[in-house]
């Protein structure tokens, strides 16, 4: 598959990587965080312009949800996700696999794909590798994720092994279908990229073998999936370390669905380049806010008369203009502005955390940064 993307490793400190990822929609400085806009918008009322203002590089949209509503064909008729959302930077769409296996009811898995009931109205839907690629071609995202089977954790070793083998077969079908869609001029984005997903539950032998298999397919990037789903954090870190030596050095590496600031710092130290998580926006809507001293619950009574910003060390528009007392009032009163401001702050924090990580890697001081902040940033204060 011809590719216009280039991952360039600029600097390395132990396993931590500082790089650039070039796409048709712009160059991503890595390590980077992808901001989760499930249905084409950040929950909490942030627009594409807001994302630009807070320093976001990449937006992540959800194939399953957009397929159900408003429909991927409508998005294609509107010119694709970039025109539809007015976000002109890179967009990654997941394959829909995780939602099919976590949200949908009455699933039936076959070699062809998965039949399931919509969580919206119960109507029957079939999705397999070809369908996932067709939907993502209509969406016109920068990066399409391959359709994979997401097994429950824990799962039996034998079933996990069979699932990995099926995911590899599905990946080959995804690659072939993307090539067909491009060749026939069907894809909204003819330069769409394909990432494969490593699975294997928490079995190191399966993880390593699966990574070896999919690395041979010469894809545009590689993701580690099926983690951060309830297993102990140390087990997640161990799986990353087991898989990392077998991930192509010249391709971008993506850890799906992770995580806390501490998780991200630790995963960067273990060789990961790209992240996504709903945590910063979800936590913000409930008043749990990230600071450089740890996590505060702005709803606590002690902030009722606090005139300070959320984080005196933060330069976001929220911290430059509003007090803890005011933001607490907004959330307690269920004012929409409260959610908007807290989500804006947390996403600013995450995106600027990544910028700080890149700066530390550039300066050769990431290890010291890791040791200082990996636990501190996840501490509740």
Task: Give residue spans per PLM region.
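C-terminal extensions of enzymes
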Residues: 1-20, 28-37, 44-45, 148-154, ...
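Non-catalytic, usually N-terminal nucleic-acid engagement modules in DNA/RNA processing proteins
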Residues: 1-188, 301-304
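A non-catalytic, amphipathic alpha-helix used as a structural packing/dimerization or gating element
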Residues: 131, 135, 162-173, 209, ...
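Generic secondary-structure signature for well-ordered alpha-helical cores
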Residues: 141, 172, 176-179, 245-248, ...
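Glycine- and acidic
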Residues: 153-156, 161, 221-227, 336-339
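Glycine-rich phosphate/ribose-binding loops and adjacent secondary-structure elements
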Residues: 165-168, 177, 181-183, 189-310
